[in-house]
């Protein structure tokens, strides 16, 4: 079957799961500013995101309702209306870019980053570094009780080893008495 006049990538799914996949990817892109996905999915998601941002430039109630019907996530629609559309107000289109990053090891699918053109990678890495520092501090605080738990596990293992040795000795005694009888 030829693919003439086909407008939709089917992604080997029925319409419901396909819509859910695209809605999820659009929401993730709006929330994080950059997502990693396959090239075909990135191209399809780019269509939807760019149409949504262009619609959001109108800024009226009917546009908000239209976006909510397409993407039922209220936070994502609010981000489109209040953040993304004003940010790209002077840009006539092309709000996203696709950066190919090679092939996925498992199935060799071609992977890509889909990100907004003004995505600030350095700021995101700085935020990530701050979060990792905070998590390191909380991990140190959690290690103190963990040491107690480790000591408790060690004593439990010692008791289990003693019980195992006793059972082994009992088994030998039974075997010896059975051999005598």
Curated annotation (Swiss-Prot):
Similarity field: Belongs to the bacterial ribosomal protein bL17 family.
Pfam families to which the protein is assigned, alphabetical: Ribosomal_L17 (PF01196)
Keywords on record: Ribonucleoprotein, Ribosomal protein
Species, as recorded: Bdellovibrio bacteriovorus (strain ATCC 15356 / DSM 50701 / NCIMB 9529 / HD100)
SUPFAM superfamilies: Prokaryotic ribosomal protein L17 (SSF64263)
HAMAP family: Ribosomal_bL17
Subunit structure, as described in the record: Part of the 50S ribosomal subunit. Contacts protein L32.
Domain of life: Bacteria
Ranges annotated as biased composition (Basic residues): 145-171
InterPro entries registered for this protein in UniProt: Ribosomal_bL17 (IPR000456), Ribosomal_bL17_sf (IPR036373)
Keyword Transcription assigned: no
Name of the protein in its database record: Large ribosomal subunit protein bL17
Lineage: Bacteria, Pseudomonadati, Bdellovibrionota, Bdellovibrionia, Bdellovibrionales
Gene3D superfamilies found in the cross-reference section: Ribosomal protein L17
Gene Ontology biological-process entries: translation
GO molecular function term, any single one: structural constituent of ribosome
Protein encoded by which gene: rplQ
Keyword check for Ribosomal protein: yes
Region named Disordered: 129-181
GO cellular component, one term: cytosolic large ribosomal subunit
């Amino acid at each position: 079957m030829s693919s003439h006049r086909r407008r939709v990538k089917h992604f080997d799914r029925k319409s419901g799961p396909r819509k859910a996949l695209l809605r999820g990817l659009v929401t993730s892109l709006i929330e994080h500013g950059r997502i990693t996905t396959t090239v075909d999915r990135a191209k399809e998601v780019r269509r939807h995101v760019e149409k949504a941002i262009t619609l959001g430039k109108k800024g009226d109630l009917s546009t908000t309702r239209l976006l909510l019907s397409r993407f039922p996530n209220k936070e994502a629609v609010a981000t489109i209306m209040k953040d993304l559309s004003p940010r790209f107000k002077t840009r006539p289109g092309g709000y996203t870019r696709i950066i190919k990053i090679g092939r996925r090891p498992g199935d060799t699918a071609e992977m890509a980053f889909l990100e907004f053109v003004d995505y600030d990678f350095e700021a995101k890495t700085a935020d990530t570094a701050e979060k990792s520092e905070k998590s390191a501090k909380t991990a140190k605080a959690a290690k103190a009780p963990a040491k107690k738990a480790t000591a408790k596990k060690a004593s439990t293992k010692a008791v289990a080893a003693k019980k195992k040795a006793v059972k082994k000795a009992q088994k030998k005694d039974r075997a010896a008495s059975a051999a005598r009888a």
